[in-house]
Amino acid sequence: MTAPDPTAHSETPGQQTVPGPQSAPGPQDSPGGRVGGAVHAVLAAETIFGALGIALAGTILGIAAPDTIAWMILIPAAIVLIARTRPWRQSLGVRGLGIAVIVGVLFALYGSSMFTAINHLQVGTAVAISMTVGLLIGLIHGQGKRRFLSPALALAGCVVFAYQALPGTVDGKAMLSSMMESLWAGVLLLAMVMMKGLASHLGYDRGAVSGVGFIIAALGFGLRDATIHGIPALNGRFIAVIIAVSCLMFVRPTVLRRIVDQQADARTQARYNVFFPAVAMVAGVVLLGQVPSLLDLVGLALITGALWIMSGVTIMPRRIFGARGSGEVTAD
């Protein structure tokens, strides 16, 4: 998936965290009660690579529209996932194909919204705002008074970001519109996880569902896009960036996630997710030359604090589209 889980939280025995885009509740504790250095390295890699993928897409926004980039990056991921899972050997049926189409469409829409947002916002700002949506799950289903402080800090962070949008100006309106796109991306992020959780609950291979969904969505959005924007010039650099973004955002989680789910507890995963917006802001500085202002840093600090607080909140109910018979949720 595209970004670390913005809604993963700590658990207590018999309780389960809410799933998120890339990370999902693994075992309550890692083997031996400790997480090894290799797992920490994988979690750090997930955070860094995901942020790099989004920022790298920003380098070709001047060449192609956000919608175009969103469906194009689905193609390399679809090829890899289909080659790995061989969905033709599985029985998806009409229901499975329907879920696959929905998953593919949600991924394409998420990419379009996020890339539209970073057209006028810093990468870290767009990612931070999108991750605030997941805090609502903790607010509704969480336990303890801390869950009320988290959304308050997140709201304050969003206000700080919005304060920089000069009212009545073209740039100000574009920034506010991009902030709304970021929030919408957060909603789509949660919807993607719910659909993949449903696919797992019904016994479908999530890699196969994603692969089939990606290729169908890419064909559909590609045909639509060709009639509106036309296909941009496919030079070597453009194709290389598309493949790199696809690998960083979609292929990477499939490879690394199995290690994390088997060995890292939910709290550890949630702690790493907290720093995803900060890493995304650094990626924006390195790849796009985006220099954050003091207000950007304040807003980022507030939202990071909100994510940190919520990462320690226990979430109920126990089961949200969990794997059949296990009570757990996993995500590719």
Residue spans of the language-model regions?
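Hydrophobic alpha-helical transmembrane segments of multi-pass membrane transport proteins
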Residues: A44, I48-A55, V101-T116, V160, ...
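Juxtamembrane helix-entry segments on the extracytoplasmic side of multipass membrane proteins
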Residues: R34-A38, G62-W71, L92-G96, Q164-V187, ...
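Cytoplasmic-side transmembrane-helix entry/capping segments in multi-pass membrane proteins
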Residues: V94-V103, G144-G157, S178, G203-F214, ...
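Hydrophobic/aromatic residues within transmembrane alpha-helices
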Residues: T59-I60, I69, A117, Q122, ...
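Hydrophobic transmembrane alpha-helices of multi-pass small-molecule transport proteins
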Residues: L81, T132, R146-P167, V274-F275, ...
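Glycine-/small-residue-enriched transmembrane alpha-helix faces in small-molecule transporters
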Residues: M1-T68, M72, V105, L109-S113, ...
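Transmembrane alpha-helices of multi-pass small-molecule transport proteins
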Residues: T2-E11, L61-L109, T132-I137, V187-M194, ...
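Helix-helix packing/entry segments at the starts of transmembrane helices
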Residues: W71-M72, A126-I129, M195-I216, F250-V286
